[in-house]
């Protein structure tokens, strides 16, 4: 089983902005191995300016949205900007877990995940003269499946507030919390303020994952490397580098990368799980089993752990096992549309159409938006 650990929130064609590529940085980190991917510089990553760039059309949208009718350019509304962004998003937005895009591409394509939507909103708020802060939400481990891989999902939202510029007068509330997954806001998960640099590293990490599952290993290394150099405290980058090293047969380097992630956070269960997978590839079954028992024990109360096991069993045609896993997940949390939809899928596979339809209707009612 392959599992990638990343803050996966989504790949569209990127806008080519007038900007030079960021300089290649010589890294002191021993878990980076440029010698394995000698042509990685042929795959330059987007600069910060490119990721947060807004076209004149997008800036005009912000200007129209924020200025109060009948007021001057100095009278602006946080609430109007946030409302306009959601209105724009609702006109055909596709929420996709694989749509990792720059701010301007998100605006034009209206297909993105919450990281890309948050990047776009941040750029728009800054153009309007507002202050914006990113927050990383501490959600339970939550996976999705894509092309045979399991992806650990993180979640980002932000707060848009009035500027400290005394020449700009805000009309209405002084700030707004912006979250493109309404369930996250309702559940009031704790969150911490994170830097723009960390957000950019998350973006690179997601792009690296896109490249990895497309078997573009050198491109993947370029993105993971950029993320690791920019924000070495981001555990996911080191875990993903470990997956990449394992996939190209460099087991010692994979071990080194997982160890680096665990030195940052010894409770990173995805790093431990990938380490178990590595031991299994090396024929060290006892150590692999020992780690797996520990990981399973610590995850058993997480509905998404059972959910992803159900997804994997369903993919492999083990329908009765899948049903058991989905039922366990449902007992732990019966409000998640993903779990309820899983029940619908497995009942359909088992030929129980009546139950499949019943759970499908429940899933539709629980889904926060039409795309889900």
What are these regions (language model features)?
Residues 43-105:
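Secondary-structure boundary elements
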Residues 213, 247-248, 277, 281-282, ...:
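Register position in tetratricopeptide repeats
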Residues 206, 240, 274, 307-308, ...:
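Canonical tetratricopeptide repeat
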